[in-house]
From Swiss-Prot:
Mg(2+) binds at residues 27, 45, 68. Changing residue 51 to A: 10-fold decrease in ZFYVE20 binding affinity. It comes from the Eukaryota. Belongs to the small GTPase superfamily. Rab family. Its cofactor is Mg(2+). This is Ras-related protein Rab-4A. It is an enzyme of class 3 (hydrolase). It comes from Homo sapiens (Human).
Amino acid sequence: MSQTAMSETYDFLFKFLVIGNAGTGKSCLLHQFIEKKFKDDSNHTIGVEFGSKIINVGGKYVKLQIWDTAGQERFRSVTRSYYRGAAGALLVYDITSRETYNALTNWLTDARMLASQNIVIILCGNKKDLDADREVTFLEASRFAQENELMFLETSALTGENVEEAFVQCARKILNKIESGELDPERMGSGIQYGDAALRQLRSPRRAQAPNAQECGC
């Protein structure tokens, strides 16, 4: 198997969203996660941008297909169509902007109404590097997350702090739900697909049983 083919082998594929008001650094978070560097010439997203990356979560290889949605109101009707079947989401606000924090409830309502039934959401307070200009306290956001059953991290797309951890935590919780039976990857609209590696494991018991069936003389 070629190195390229090996690098594309994964156990699961998860559809992710990055949502929140314009100017919160959503595209910069995605760029930092994919490229491991800060995107310093970022303009507001027009419609939807896309990125993907394979990560190792507890020994499972998970490919994240990530849709970065525009935060401006005029694009909401377009971006809502991408919510369908999302398994996970980063709900992003800017810790230096009270306005972006106050808009979280609307974004959360859209995600839970339009995405998959069991969508896993992590709240990300971005621009942690601008702590001196903070308008939203860690405690206040932590309470919001607890009240709405969200995970929560403060992140910095500039320094990279907690950026990968946000995606990994969200993916880990989805994996836990699959293992517990709460999520079924084969259910339409789950936002989850089996990768080649997982499909091989699912099929291997059937192959192992085949010789026994042939040996039967009845």
